[in-house]
Amino acid sequence: MTVSQIPIAAIATAPGRGGIGVVRVSGPDVGAVMRAVCGRALQPRHATYLPFLDARGNVIDHGLALYFPAPNSYTGEEVLELQGHGGPVVMQMLLSRCLEAGKDIGLRVAEPGEFTRRAFLNDKLDLAQAEAVADLIEASTEAAARSAARSMEGEFSKAIHALVEKVIHLRMLVEATLDFPEEEIDFLEASNARGQLTRIREDLAGVLKQARQGSLLREGLSVVLAGQPNVGKSSLLNALAGSDLAIVTPIAGTTRDRVRETIQIDGIPLHIIDTAGLRDDAADEVERIGIERTWEAIRHADIVLHLIDAADYIEHGISETDDHIDDRLSGQLPPGSPIVRVINKIDLAPSVGAMGFGGNRPHVVAANGPNPTEIWISARTGAGIDLMRSELLRLIGWQSGNEGAFLARERHLIALRNAESHLELAEASASQHAQALDLFAEELRLAQDHLNSITGEFTSDDLLGTIFTRFCIGK
């Protein structure tokens, strides 16, 4: 038997107790399981309330049974779904009974994601839609769930297919010019091939922009709170989270280890990490280890908020220690990850200090040369917290109220960027016309391959295995 000819079964609902639990069976000849467990054949696509029977005819449970003939099912195969009471013992008994009834047809327990993988292999959905199924299940915000649902409905795939069709059309023109060089008609000039390529690149840029937004919804951002001891990092974490997660005292070095909390800003998950204060003279070994872990968190951060005491900053400007922290942050952060100075405790700061500027009101100072963006707040009173949220969204390029976004993964962004690079090379080769038509055609082909990898039309088995094994068992 091939994989598609072997029937599979699994508990499709989450582990634990619940009002309803579902056992799903998919594959050829599941009618044998249906008749054994349900006691009779079922009318296709109709829910039937009946007892589920063991091998001796004793009742395991009462529930709903649904039978979907191929190809009109989730997997494209015959599917039987048994909906009973959601206790773990009952569900395991029902699954065991299905496996027992299906032993003659080779029924086995499904691997993680195998139902959805079969749906993909049977053309019930493409790879981007299949990934969206898992993303919908794992969505951590309402906005992420809505975007995953749009991807599952095919919004992302439609955008990719539209790009691929345009690339194919342009490839046809280039191939025609290569195959019939003696023709008097210049296919590329007659069809404005360069204009077509420009429009394709513009369309791709639009899809990539939407995909970046979707990636923010799915992945969220890692935001590290860093700075010297006792500058209000834990207070800021509590203010952003809306609860007292971290211990706050006037004693420097209170936070010894990282404290992590996930919050939402406009639907984007922000993973806020409070860290040990940064100083050279750690009080003890525990604090030293905490500082090392701070720098480890910084090396994986998307944004670092460098907190600075407002009163000291107004009186003396950036201190030598904070300037050194900024320099080290620049060297430790991943490329493209911004540093934001958060000037905290403005409620305790004078209106005008020795440096000649005021700081007892919330405001933002835009980045200027080597100086990063500054946000002036009071974590204790909450002044400026909403301003900070808005500024963080601006810094990451988030478009508020972007209801049209679809969810995207890192591999999608990589594929889109690779396609973008090949289209750029295609445009460069097009300027050489006849001398580089072969190169022009090849770059278009490579761009098409990268786009097709998103929907699974050109995808390695290794990638498929990686994607589907991350699903839950019953999906």
From Swiss-Prot:
Q: Where in the cell is it found?
A: Cytoplasm
Q: Which InterPro entries match?
A: G_TrmE (IPR031168), GTP-bd (IPR006073), GTP-bd_TrmE_N (IPR018948), GTPase_MnmE (IPR004520), MnmE_dom2 (IPR027368), MnmE_helical (IPR025867), P-loop_NTPase (IPR027417), Small_GTP-bd (IPR005225)
Which residues make up the binding site for GTP?
230-235, 249-255, 274-277, 378-380
**Xref: CDD domains:** trmE (cd04164), TrmE_N (cd14858)
Alphabetic keyword roster: Cytoplasm, GTP-binding, Hydrolase, Magnesium, Metal-binding, Nucleotide-binding, Potassium, tRNA processing
TrmE-type G domain: residues covered: 220-397
For the keyword Magnesium, the answer is yes
Xref: SUPFAM superfamilies: P-loop containing nucleoside triphosphate hydrolases, TrmE connector domain
- Per its UniProt record, what Pfam families does this chain match? MMR_HSR1, MnmE_helical, TrmE_N
Under the subunit heading, UniProt states: Homodimer. Heterotetramer of two MnmE and two MnmG subunits.
Functional description taken from the UniProt entry = Exhibits a very high intrinsic GTPase hydrolysis rate. Involved in the addition of a carboxymethylaminomethyl (cmnm) group at the wobble position (U34) of certain tRNAs, forming tRNA-cmnm(5)s(2)U34.
NCBIfam families recorded for this chain?
Answer: mnmE_trmE_thdF, PRK05291.1-3, small_GTP
Q: What is this protein called?
A: tRNA modification GTPase MnmE
Organism of provenance? Cupriavidus metallidurans (strain ATCC 43123 / DSM 2839 / NBRC 102507 / CH34)
| Name of the gene this protein is made from | mnmE
